[in-house]
Amino acid sequence: MSEATFDEAALADELAAILAQLIARPSTVPPGDTRTIAAFASQRLRSAGYTTETASRAEGLDNVVATLGSGEPWIVFNVHADTVDAGNRADWRTDPFEGVREGDRVVGLGAANCKGGMATHLWLADEIARRGGPSKGRVSFTFVADEETMGPDGTRFLRDAGLVRPDILIIGAPTANRMVVTERGVLWVRITTTGRGAHAGDPDAGDNAIVRMGRVIRALEDGLGPRLAERRDGALASTMNLGLIRGGNNTNVVPAGCLAEIDRRLLPGEDVDAAFAEIAEIVERAGEPDGTVRTERLLGANGFSAPVDRGAVAAFGAAIEGRTGVAAAFAHTIGASDGRYFADDGIEIIVFGPGDDAEGHAANESVPIAALVDAARIQIEAVDTLLGLDRPSG
């Protein structure tokens, strides 16, 4: 499709307007209620000719699945509709729920993470329908809840319920329109130590659970730390972080309990089950008395890596180069996307979208309108390559 087929100024206005409409529909966590914004997306895509379904496993956490076409390949575009809270309103120069256009940017809560990406997906869905839909295969758009809390009631629910079984999954996220095709896995582990309470004036009469936790943590640092230091894959590292520790209830009491939670990030070649077993084995070897230490897995998913020279990655790469005039750049993220729920399915997963991740979760969050336009143009070209669209939009 030629550059002349789009009025770029009109496209910029359309995308900015869609984004403002999304920002004006709060979906903050807590409580993460996506019913209003999901209804908006569902109605828009149903009007465009999509078959739509709104599905939820938890009250208020609505997820939309909108599909056009049939058969294979099945491309699923996914983006989360929930946002973090706006925080202190005094830190915002505009109403965070207004979607204000300031020069060449749109400012508002979720502008970068991830309502900017959602705006481009809604436009993309409309444009695919305007061009007659896929000539082969099908495309689905999913707008999900429960991402900001890494919860199970958004993308994971859609996969578990069998509502989407993609061959290609495109996760909308603020990557500055660069592709992320390799993502680390994630494992959260909780360790609980128990002891025996006593008066602090006679600590030997008790058994200090915090001190016990200290020994367990030291065992993990000494036993796992050196191993992780040797596990690297280019710019990616295998990591462990002690992110939370909580114990005791008063300064003058020997604590009878302590809890710690650990975040492990895994290279795509590592296995989440093996990573948990490795932690549990080191904790066991710490030598604490039986029944005084418990290790449990809170959540876990493997990482993923897509081939960079074929399939969807090649289609996106060609579209990016066609739009920007330079070869596609690949990015890495320190976080985890909802793509992790499909990491073991043997499919292509790409994380891609407008905006800078550093803008997310901050006051005066914004996204460049030009980045929205680029994301929209790149994605429609990639879909055209992968599914074939019947006619250009004029």
Model-derived features: positions:
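Active-site metal-coordination/substrate-binding segment of hydrolases
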Residues: 74-140
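Short helix-capping segments at alpha-helix termini
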Residues: 48, 131-135, 163, 285-290, ...
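Acidic-glycine-rich active-site phosphate/pyrophosphate-binding loop
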Residues: 86-101, 166, 181-192, 350
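A structural signal for isolated positions on well-ordered beta-strands in alpha/beta enzyme cores
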Residues: 53, 76, 140-142, 294
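N-terminal helical capping/dimerization or prosegment-like subdomains
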Residues: 2-89, 257-261, 275-278, 315, ...
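Fold-level recognition of mixed alpha/beta catalytic cores in primary-metabolism enzymes, strongest
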Residues: 111-112, 116-222, 361-374
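Metal-dependent amide/peptide-bond hydrolase catalytic core
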Residues: 1-3, 10, 56-58, 181, ...
